[in-house]
Design a protein with these regions (language model features):
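Beta-alpha junction/loop-to-helix N-cap segments that form part of ligand/metal-binding clefts
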Residues: 27-29, 38, 52-59, 71-145, ...
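Immediate post-signal peptide segment of exported/extracytoplasmic ligand-binding proteins
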Residues: 24-42, 73-78, 171-177, 349
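Segments of small-molecule ligand-sensing domains
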Residues: 317-329, 340-398
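Extracellular/periplasmic periplasmic-binding protein-like sensory domains
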Residues: 251-332, 405-409
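Extracytoplasmic "Venus flytrap"
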Residues: 28-37, 42-62, 84-91, 113-114, ...
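Hydrophobic alpha-helical segments within soluble ligand-binding/sensing domains
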Residues: 93, 154-178, 218-221, 244, ...
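Extracytoplasmic ligand/sensor domains, especially the bilobed periplasmic-binding protein
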Residues: 105-211, 261-290
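Short, low-complexity disordered leader/linker segments with a strong preference
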Residues: 1-40, 410-411
Length: 411
């Protein structure tokens, strides 16, 4: 009888241990960041430093997720968006991203900002099969190197293609152009220049001077002075907002008034008006040409569109603490919409793999925050979600569209 009790006790203990081991195994196999009620995602953004104006993107994206949560969430789950400040410094991006993955156990890194910051953790995230998606940078890498880095995908039109648009336009419309180029001397700026030169084609000999700057420089006035001295009558700027504004202001102060082409990430109404105010004249920004692919908050052409109506509702309800007419708000919400759309299609019990599958099987015109008619399209062999844009010219305090929506080959 005593032996039976001992045997039964041992069997019971084995059952408990087995059950515990099974439960532990199941817990380990569960998708990180996903519970029955919540999906946790995260990203690093520059809330401080030279690129802090981009922090608006994260705040608006978070506001959109709050709006979605207030209206039922996604497949019964609320989205929690954890953002950390890396100051646009890759040395900070690495430990902060590891914190998001290893301590916060995020489901995915969504919207992470900056070419160099994103590159600094791409290998780490891909080796751990953590989705690094809809990154806030148009570097061509995200679309061209997908075989080596299958867990990374961008969102916005890529910089090479955008640069080509400006080059093609100048080659076609400014036969006597003498071009000075200012670019951020890293992968971000070099992508723009590569596309710009390709767009110029045989006209690339119109470039008379190129100047690269470092984000650690306090002033780029010396670069602008050299560009002016070159005799350039056309100025292509591939810079982040702080340096783009500085370039415009310094050119004005030096009494240099070339035809200016400005990359889209710095070409917003808010930033142009800040530049004009700093220069002391609207003439400093008059006629600047840039491109757009999202709705512009204070553009009367889109005031009555469903996207702009939704935008104002989200801003009023969630109060992200950003300026209503800051175009980076729309960027953030458009990005948020893209993630929510993919999460819905990733299934009732989403996995990291099913999220990537959804992102790579997209074909929609439904994103309300993009320009009317724009298509978001991907496939197993096409990892560039957006490849359309429209040329805009700054006049009367805001960018005015001209020409049609352009579709360009991804590069």
């Amino acid at each position: 009888m005593n032996k039976q009790i001992v045997v039964l006790g041992v069997l019971a203990l084995l059952l408990v241990v087995t059950a515990a081991a099974t439960a532990s195994s199941t817990a380990r196999e569960a998708t990180p960041g996903v519970t029955k009620k919540q999906v946790v995602i995260g990203a690093t953004f520059p809330f401080s430093g030279v690129a802090s104006s981009y922090g608006v993107i994260a705040k608006a994206e978070a506001a959109y997720y709050k709006w979605v949560n207030a209206h039922g969430g996604v497949n019964g789950r609320k989205i929690k968006f954890v953002t950390l400040d890396d100051g646009y410094n890759p040395a900070k991006t690495v430990p902060l991203t590891k914190e998001l993955v290893e301590q916060d156990h995020v489901f995915a890194i969504v919207g992470q900002l900056g070419t160099e910051p994103v590159l600094s953790v791409r290998q780490y995230l891909n080796s751990h099969k953590v989705p690094q998606v809809l990154v806030s940078t148009g570097a061509s890498y995200w679309g061209t190197q997908y075989k080596k880095y299958p867990w990374t995908i961008g969102w916005q039109p890529n910089y090479v293609a955008e640069g080509a648009i400006y080059g093609q336009y100048i080659d076609a419309h400014q036969k006597s152009a003498k071009i000075g180029v200012l670019f951020q001397n890293d992968d971000y700026g070099k992508d723009y220049v590569r596309g710009f030169r390709a767009g110029l084609g045989k006209g690339k000999n119109k470039i008379v001077k190129s100047e690269g700057y470092s984000i650690t420089e306090q002033s780029i006035a010396a670069h602008i002075a050299l560009l002016k001295a070159s005799g350039a009558n056309t100025f292509f700027i591939a810079a982040t907002p702080t340096f783009a504004i500085q370039a415009i202001v310094v050119a004005s102060k030096l009494n240099w008034h070339p035809k200016i082409y400005l990359n889209s990430v710095s070409g917003t109404n808010d930033l142009m008006n800040i530049a004009a105010q700093s220069a002391g004249s609207q003439d400093a920004v008059k006629g600047i040409i840039s491109t757009a692919y999202t709705l512009i908050p204070d553009d009367p052409h889109y005031a009555k569109t469903p996207g702009m109506k939704l935008y104002r509702k989200v801003m009023a309800a969630e109060k992200p603490g950003t300026r209503l007419n800051d175009a980076f708000n729309v960027y953030g919400m458009g990005q948020g919409w893209a993630f929510v759309n993919a999460l819905k299609r990733a299934g009732k019990n989403p996995t990291r793999k099913s999220l990537m599958k959804a992102l790579l099987h997209t074909n929609t015109r439904a994103n309300p925050f993009l320009l009317p008619g724009m298509v978001t399209k991907t496939s197993a062999s096409d990892h560039f979600p957006l490849n359309q844009a429209r040329l805009d010219k700054f006049q009367g305090g805001h960018f005015v569209p001209f020409g049609k929506l352009l579709t360009y080959p991804n590069q």
